[in-house]
């Protein structure tokens, strides 16, 4: 006899919870084993222990001489200097010098662009450079990183998670050839049930369906039974970087934090929202969940489709057709320029997303508005914000009124004092969690995507997003940001100075270790 649907979901949640407990126990066991090994070496093998201390000291110099952010260097330096052997072993296990070795990703080239496409992008860059030299420089830089600049693309900014996800599902209903999805979190719930209904119908019509999600992000939310159901209806599923396969993966860095949906090559989505009920405010978590996203139609969709294909094939997946089959088949009407980008730890020390943020902030002459749920930035980003505000640019940072990670928000607060001193205006979204990740500069250039203003997004996770230059969607983004500030409380210097003592103490103590939060 078939079990009731509610009972099945309850059993799945229990199974997922047990898996998380197992991973937590293994992680604690790993740390305990390192501590025991440290104690044994210190007591019984003094010479070996001393040699490891010297090696640890050498690693401190090595870490600080390599390219990378100061926050990353400071965190590891403090840990290794405080407990040299423990810190050294954890560095070997959890970080290493080559993040790509922590991932089972094949070394493959990205799907290649034709010379005609590369030349078209260069011509568009020159056109943008003539109209807006500062944004032309940014577009040229990203073009050299392999992210072409496009016209012939429509862009629609979707100002809430509800609008974003509803629009996405409506377009999936119209799919005729393929649906590709890559998300950090996929979770059972009402939204998932709607998506599964679409998948069943489309799989029955012969539509190619591929789903890729991050194991850590979805661990408690997407049980194995749901994955098997996906496969039974004909969808292909890959799970990014399973945390339980190897001891050195019992960690939450090097995750796939992207949000990508590609439909028939001509439509693509990215933004801040994942596939879970709270993002559409079907269920309430942390008050009102304010998210956003963007829909692209036309030529620029190829970059997001290409990045999905690249990740899929590096994880060992295969396609039913050649790469060119998945390219856009139409050109959409749209003003301005569109430039989707992607980023990941395997490209370090180059960070396309962080560099784009720095140039958006540094290139602005009048205003820079930013939304982000987190703030854990390097000295270069903090300096860019302070210099922009100090030179008369209207810099505004919008953050949650109800944060989802309290310790992470204490770290964010630790930056407020310096930013306020230089004239940065900070707003906290009173109704709840502001989860969107956007930047708007001078109403001329903007970013919408998955990238938080923190070290993990800039250096440790796989991310994506879209740059807009002179596109009408930026006016919708500006209206949304104005609406956010109307519902927000501006943080004053007095507010910051009188924050709870626990926030002041923990914010300062945890700040060097933000890469682990």
Show which residues each predicted segment covers.
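N-terminal localization/anchoring segments of enzymes in phospholipid and broader phosphate metabolism
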Residues: 1-355, 359, 363, 403, ...
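Short, glycine-rich nucleotide/cofactor-binding loops
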Residues: 185-190, 370-378
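A general structural signal for well-ordered alpha-helical packing
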Residues: 354, 382, 412-416
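Helical hairpin unit composed of two closely spaced alpha helices linked by a short loop
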Residues: 359, 364, 374-395, 400, ...
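C-terminal structural cap/anchor segments
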Residues: 393-397, 401-453
């Amino acid at each position: 006899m078939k079990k009731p649907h509610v009972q099945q979901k309850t059993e799945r949640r229990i199974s997922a919870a047990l898996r998380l407990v197992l991973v937590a126990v293994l992680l604690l066991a790993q740390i305990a084993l390192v501590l025991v090994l440290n104690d044994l070496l210190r007591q019984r093998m003094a010479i070996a222990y001393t040699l490891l201390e010297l090696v640890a000291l050498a690693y401190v110099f090595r870490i600080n001489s390599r390219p990378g952010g100061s926050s990353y260097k400071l965190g590891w330096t403090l840990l290794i200097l405080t407990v040299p052997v423990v810190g050294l072993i954890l560095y070997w296990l959890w970080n290493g010098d080559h993040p790509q070795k922590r991932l089972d990703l094949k070394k493959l080239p990205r799907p290649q662009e034709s010379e005609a496409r590369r030349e078209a992008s260069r011509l568009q860059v020159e056109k943008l450079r003539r109209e807006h030299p500062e944004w032309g420089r940014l577009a040229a830089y990203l073009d050299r990183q392999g992210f072409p600049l496009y016209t012939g693309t429509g862009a629609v900014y979707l100002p809430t998670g509800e609008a974003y996800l509803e629009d996405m599902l409506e377009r999936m209903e119209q799919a005729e050839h393929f649906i590709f999805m890559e998300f950090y979190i996929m979770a059972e719930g009402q939204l998932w049930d709607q998506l599964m209904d679409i998948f069943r119908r489309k799989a029955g019509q012969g539509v190619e369906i591929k789903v890729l999600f991050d194991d850590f992000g979805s661990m408690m939310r997407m049980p194995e039974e749901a994955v098997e159901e996906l496969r039974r209806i004909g969808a292909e599923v890959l799970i990014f970087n399973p945390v339980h396969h190897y001891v050195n993966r019992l960690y939450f860095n090097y995750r796939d934090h992207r949000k990508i949906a590609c439909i028939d090559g001509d439509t693509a989505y990215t933004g801040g929202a994942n596939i879970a009920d709270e993002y559409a405010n079907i269920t309430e978590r942390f008050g009102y969940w304010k998210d956003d996203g963007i829909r692209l139609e036309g030529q620029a969709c190829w970059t997001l489709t290409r990045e999905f294909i690249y990740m899929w094939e590096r994880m060992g997946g295969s396609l039913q057709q050649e790469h060119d089959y998945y390219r856009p088949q139409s050109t959409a009407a749209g003003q301005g320029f569109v430039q989707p980008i992607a980023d990941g730890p395997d490209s370090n020390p180059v960070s396309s997303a962080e560099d784009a943020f720095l140039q958006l902030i540094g290139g602005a002459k009048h205003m820079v508005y930013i939304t982000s749920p987190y703030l854990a930035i390097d000295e270069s980003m903090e300096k860019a914000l302070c210099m922009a505000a100090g030179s008369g640019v209207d810099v505004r940072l919008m953050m949650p009124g109800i944060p989802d990670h309290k310790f992470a928000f204490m770290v964010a607060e630790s930056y407020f004092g310096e930013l306020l001193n230089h004239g940065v205006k900070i707003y906290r979204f009173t109704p709840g969690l502001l989860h969107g990740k956007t930047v708007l500069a001078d109403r001329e250039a903007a970013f919408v995507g998955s990238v938080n203003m923190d070290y993990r997004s800039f250096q440790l996770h796989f991310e994506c997003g879209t740059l807009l230059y002179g596109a009408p969607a930026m006016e919708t983004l500006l209206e949304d940001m104005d609406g956010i500030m109307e519902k927000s409380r501006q943080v004053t210097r007095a507010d910051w100075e009188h924050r709870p003592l626990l926030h002041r103490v923990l914010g300062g103590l945890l700040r060097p270790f933000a890469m682990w939060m």
